[in-house]
Amino acid sequence: MPKKDLYEILGVDRNASQEEIKKAYRRLAKKYHPDLNPGDKEAEQKFKEINEAYEILSDPQKRAQYDQFGHAAFEQGGSQQGGFGDFGEGGFDFDFGGFGDIFGDIFSDFFGTGRRKAEKGPKKGADIRYDLTLTFEEAAFGTEKEIEVERFEVCDVCHGTGVKPGSRPETCPVCHGTGEIRQTQNTPFGRIVNIRTCPRCHGEGKIITDPCQKCGGTGKIRKRRKIKVTIPAGIDEGQMLTLRGEGEPGLRGGPNGDLYIVIHVKPHEIFKREGYDVYVKIPISFADAALGGEIKIPTLDGMVSFTIPEGTQTGTKFKLRGKGIPHIGGRGRGDQIVEVYVEVPKRLSEKQKELLREFKRLEGENTAEHKSFFQRMRDAFGGS
């Protein structure tokens, strides 16, 4: 029986790029893998075919030979070199290092393994969070704060090596300096080579037998440090300031982490903030509401005078432009919204009561509002 065309097996054109071949292989390998198709002989055979096809087409030299001579280029000696064995005794021997990241990705999905190699290069230090509480005014206008942060710093005796001065780290006897442990696992479908970080040296390849006495071999010591922080005007609840390089020290020469300062703002007794605007409710007297006039209004900058019109009602709002929160970056300020409510006096002198009775007598039902209200009452209850 003639053998199938390798390009057809992977479902790609003969002019397909290496990246297209790789994508097609990964898709088919996951689809027909025996673990996802237990007992399916057809899927098992298909899996073998796509592996054989990919081994040849992923190698530029083998691909060129196949394009020129077809399957005959690999039939000398009875079998192709370096290919995959049949399912059966011994089965497949998958070494993730030999097939690049293809099987590393596939088998990390199927077996929970991966080809995560030990990190040996520089690594950034851990970040630190600090919660800072400000008063309403401090958040509005900005301020300077000194905070105290506890963090790890590079040991000043061993300079971060963790080794006692005059000593040197030794090669790890478990991984022999590679930082990795390779384990072979036999499965019903072959042998899986699992690569993991060495538990003895944690991927470093070296161990410390004579540690620094000050840091105990960690290379860092815990210290409390005071840091001055500039709080910009206009900052709000939940916003965050970032101080680069003020976090934990990096590993293997890596940069320090960052310090994140999370802002909290205490509630104000009378002011309420919404965005860059400030809201305040103030009482006015019955006389001021009726006659209008000048009243005093508290603002973030102090008391200011404001003239309200006669007949001002409870719930009326006025806007004081530019009296709100400064915009971050100095681009102007928000506004202050003033809502007034009429405060009814609880205690009146006899003179005040007399004047109000006279006012009530004179007022009668002459206002349009009252006429409208009493007319609606008469209509509702059938009055004449």
Curated annotation (Swiss-Prot):
What does the note under cofactor report?
Binds 2 Zn(2+) ions per monomer.
Which residues belong to any copy of the J domain? 5-70
Record-linked CDD domains: DnaJ, DnaJ_C, DnaJ_zf
Just give the chief location class.
cytoplasm
Pfam families per record? DnaJ, DnaJ_C, DnaJ_CXXCXGXG
Query: Zinc fingers (CR-type) span which residues?
Result: 142-224
- Which protein is depicted? Chaperone protein DnaJ
The alphabetized UniProt keywords are:
Chaperone, Cytoplasm, DNA replication, Metal-binding, Repeat, Stress response, Zinc, Zinc-finger
CXXCXGXG motif repeats sit at 155-162, 172-179, 198-205, 212-219
Natural source organism: Caldanaerobacter subterraneus subsp. tengcongensis (strain DSM 15242 / JCM 11007 / NBRC 100824 / MB4) (Thermoanaerobacter tengcongensis)
